[in-house]
From Swiss-Prot:
GO terms for biological process: menaquinone biosynthetic process. Mg(2+) binds at residues 162, 191, 214. It comes from Klebsiella pneumoniae (strain 342). Keywords: Lyase, Magnesium, Menaquinone biosynthesis, Metal-binding. The keyword Magnesium applies. One of its GO terms (molecular function) is O-succinylbenzoate synthase activity. InterPro entries: Enolase-like_C_sf, Enolase-like_N, Enolase_C-like, Mandelate_racemase_C, OSB_synthase_MenC1, OSBS_N. The gene is menC. The keyword Lyase applies. Belongs to the mandelate racemase/muconate lactonizing enzyme family. MenC type 1 subfamily. The active site is at residues 134, 236. Its cofactor is a divalent metal cation. It is an enzyme of class 4 (lyase). It catalyses: (1R,6R)-6-hydroxy-2-succinyl-cyclohexa-2,4-diene-1-carboxylate = 2-succinylbenzoate + H2O. This is o-succinylbenzoate synthase.
């Protein structure tokens, strides 16, 4: 016998979370829970405002239709909406024992630019020291100075930077001007510095700073190609699609010698623990980008190791099915 349940949830966010110039006050999403015989599997569906093409309402409609059909014995195809496809495929992978339990809970800590704060976070990190800095939110010159300061203060630090296509070529050059050329090799990569791929490629050629593709992966004309200056691809499964599609993208990147980084779209603790399992399975040599739980006020259903945030259990969720 099959049972499918759908829950809706909402968590207040940290007051400082701004995405694409809009403040994110709450994180809203859905869970699907599949049960068959003695097995069960969970999945999270949480489109990210400003980044996902689908709205939560569209995702909910598609999810409920799929869940009802599956419960009634059908084998419906996955919906085309990426967040829904990923969440359902995670639930199926858990249900059928296809998502390994081993998880990579290492996280490249998000850094605000205070070296002392970062020192404390990195001191507890085993192995390589990797942190992430969001750039492009302030003046490019300030970003360059902050990055330079961190690289200077922590000699074994590797930084991942994310600009979300915020810069014109001129602003990107202003940033690079303030980063000592001797430190630039310790920028693991800079995600999408400019508004176009061509400008980002030119930036890498001119500065020697490696870049990574993120938003580009979701554009119709994107192809996986090895090219000078491109070091990595950042894969956000909630924005990508099914677990199978994530597998395909990781394999395509690795075949070209590129790093693939599994990265958060600000999922709940349940979704983050599943991303940690996907990362341990598909990208075991690469620290994932999952340091987003602290942006929320609570955990949901499953805990993230060592998080002190309060836990909200199933009983507090809104059942839709």
């Amino acid at each position: 016998m099959r049972v499918s349940q759908v829950y809706r949830w909402q968590i207040p966010m940290d007051a400082g979370v701004v995405l694409r110039e809009r403040r994110l006050k709450t994180r809203d999403g859905l869970f699907i829970r599949l049960q068959e015989d003695e097995r069960e599997g969970w999945g999270e569906i949480s489109p990210l405002p400003g980044f996902s093409n689908e709205t939560l309402e569209e995702a909910q409609t598609a999810l409920l239709a799929w869940a009802q059909a599956w419960r009634d014995g059908a084998e419906p195809p996955l919906p085309t909406l990426p967040s829904v496809a990923f969440g359902i495929s995670c639930a199926q992978a858990e249900l059928y024992g296809e998502l390994p339990q081993a998880a990579d809970y290492r996280a490249a800590p998000l850094c605000s630019g205070d070296p002392d704060e970062l020192f404390a976070k990195l001191a507890a990190m085993p192995g390589e020291k990797v942190a992430k800095v969001k750039v492009g939110l302030w003046e490019a010159v300030r970003d360059g100075m902050v990055v330079n300061l961190l690289l200077e203060a922590i000699p074994d630090l590797q930084l991942r930077l994310d600009a979300n296509r915020a810069w014109t070529p001129l602003k990107a050059q202003q940033f690079a001007k303030y980063v000592n050329p001797a430190y630039r090799q310790r920028i693991a990569f800079l995600e999408e510095p400019c508004k176009t791929r061509e400008d980002s490629r030119a930036f890498s050629r001119e500065t020697g700073i490696a870049i990574a593709w993120d938003e580009s992966l979701r554009e119709a004309d994107f192809r996986f190609v090895a090219e000078p200056g491109v070091r990595a691809v950042v894969i956000k499964p909630t924005l990508t699609g099914s677990v199978q599609k994530v597998q395909q993208q990781v394999a395509a990147a690795h075949a070209l010698g590129l790093s693939a980084v599994i990265s958060s779209s600000i999922e709940s603790s349940l979704g983050l623990t599943q991303l940690a399992r996907v990362a341990a399975w598909l990208t075991p040599q690469t620290i994932p980008g999952l340091d987003t739980l602290a942006l929320m006020s609570a955990q949901l259903v499953r805990p993230w190791p060592e998080s002190t945030l309060p836990m909200i259990n199933i009983d507090a969720l809104e059942p839709l099915l």
